[in-house]
Amino acid sequence: MGLCSDRWITRMSREHGMIEPFEDRQVRQGVISYGVSSYGYDMRVAREFKIFTNVLSSVVDPKAFDPKSFVEFEGDVCIVPPNSFALARSVEYFRIPRNVLTLTVGKSTYARCGIITNVTPFEPEWEGYVTLEISNTTPLPAKIYANEGIAQVVFFTGDEPPEVSYGDKKGKYQGQHGVTLPRI
């Protein structure tokens, strides 16, 4: 399994639409950086958010998640309440090749402020906008800046294609648009 370089990421995005829209350089001036980097791609967070609220005093159940537990918000800056989280989506649409798996890690700029981004791996032949989970681990409100970097995606090629890809099994998050809540 090999880690993929900026050249590979750029070629796959330009020739095969792996990342759209694709930023072929790292944009850094006055923003939290995004775009291609040496061995990854810093994706951006879009303007649509679902901010968790516990006004219903409910139990969080991934098998029966109540959509009323979220407040929908659209804007350039999202305020995540203390010790809470928000769901968001990427600006970029991803199409993962059959022999590739990705891992995603949060940006250090946010992590150093107690803001953690979680994303599960993009499996072979998965495609869609990425649903991001953004946790504010601090006792204070935290700002998230739309259309700026939120997490870095690193791409790994397998030594051979999988027998069954995410696309083959018609995974439940295939082709997702918008912020997608848990599905069973």
From Swiss-Prot:
Q: What span is annotated as the signal peptide, if there is one? A: none
Residue positions annotated to bind dCTP are: K107, S108, T109, Y110, A111, R112, T131, L132, E133, Q152, Y166, Q176
Q: Where is the active site?
A: E133 (proton donor/acceptor)
Its UniProt pathway annotation is:
Pyrimidine metabolism; dUMP biosynthesis; dUMP from dCTP (dUTP route): step 1/2
Give the top-rank taxon of the lineage listed in the UniProt record for this protein: Bacteria
- GO molecular function per UniProt: dCTP deaminase activity; nucleotide binding
Under the heading Gene3D superfamilies, the entry gives: 2.70.40.10
Q: Name one GO biological process term.
A: nucleobase-containing small molecule interconversion
- Fetch the InterPro entries from UniProt: dCTP_deaminase, dUTPase-like_sf, dUTPase_trimeric
Write out the entry's keywords from A to Z: Hydrolase, Nucleotide metabolism, Nucleotide-binding
Catalysed reaction equations from the record: dCTP + H2O + H(+) = dUTP + NH4(+)
> What top-level class of enzyme does the UniProt entry assign?
hydrolase
Q: What is its EC number?
A: 3.5.4.13
Mind telling me which NCBIfam families this protein's record contains?
A: dCTP_deam
Oligomeric state and partners?
Answer: Homotrimer.
Q: What does this protein do?
A: Catalyzes the deamination of dCTP to dUTP.
The text of the family note is: Belongs to the dCTP deaminase family.
What is the official name of this protein in its record?
dCTP deaminase
- Species per Swiss-Prot/TrEMBL record: Gemmatimonas aurantiaca (strain DSM 14586 / JCM 11422 / NBRC 100505 / T-27)
Question: What gene name does this entry carry?
Answer: dcd
